[in-house]
Design a protein with these regions (language model features):
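N-terminal export signals
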Residues: 1-10
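Conserved positions within compact, well-structured domain cores
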Residues: 11-200
């Protein structure tokens, strides 16, 4: 089982943790500019969020349009995730489905991997993880394609950068119970958390 080896944040790179052959950011991304310095629009209005998603325009927002717990980061739509200007810091990228599967396998798979990925605090009583990996996943919830917010403090949703043949993408989810890491197709106009990955 690949337990994580932590590295602190610097001015150039996020805090990270090495798990198996991968290096992952140790917190949800919270940048509001692309790597080239261009601003990513903050879109608080529900109608404007829906319009941005339909048009493929990048957007970000804090869960609930308000201050959130430390480590939650911000929620991005898929256009921000895949924008060629780059969402993750230099040397990192948004993971694809294979990266997520590799991470899960390095931690033993199934419920064991899920518990290792979840933070030891910040979840409802009795459902926190062990955080043995150092990944520290938190239940930052998601924003629907219509602009509503759901399941903050209950579920963690993470983007992958792959787009499916039917136009959707795959979300990777950790629940407020003992279920394993879960994958589900979601609309690209959703708002979800982002982690970044690099070779170890």
């Amino acid at each position: 089982m690949g337990l994580g080896i932590a590295a602190p944040a610097t001015a150039e790179t996020p805090g990270s943790v090495t798990i198996g052959a991968q290096r992952w950011s140790a917190e949800n991304l919270a940048v509001t500019r692309f790597r080239n310095g261009d601003a990513i629009p903050e879109v608080s209005d529900a109608g404007a969020w829906a319009a941005a998603g339909r048009a493929g325009r990048p957007a970000w927002i804090r869960y609930g349009n308000t201050a959130t717990p430390a480590g939650w980061g911000v929620l991005y739509n898929f256009a921000a995730v895949t924008d060629p200007r780059g969402l993750c810091p230099a040397g990192f990228r948004v993971p694809d489905n294979r990266d997520w599967r590799q991470l899960e396998a390095a931690l033993g798979g199934g419920k064991t991997a899920a518990a290792s990925l979840k933070a030891a605090t910040g979840w409802p009583t009795g459902v926190a993880g062990s955080n043995r990996s150092g990944f520290g996943a938190l239940p930052a919830g998601f924003r629907t394609q219509q602009g509503a917010f759901f399941l903050g403090r209950r579920v963690a949703y993470f983007w992958s950068r792959d787009r499916e043949a039917n136009g959707t993408t795959i979300a990777h989810m950790l629940f407020d119970d003992d279920r394993p890491l879960f994958r589900i197709e979601y609309d690209v106009a959703m708002g979800m958390s982002v982690r970044c990955v690099a070779p170890a």
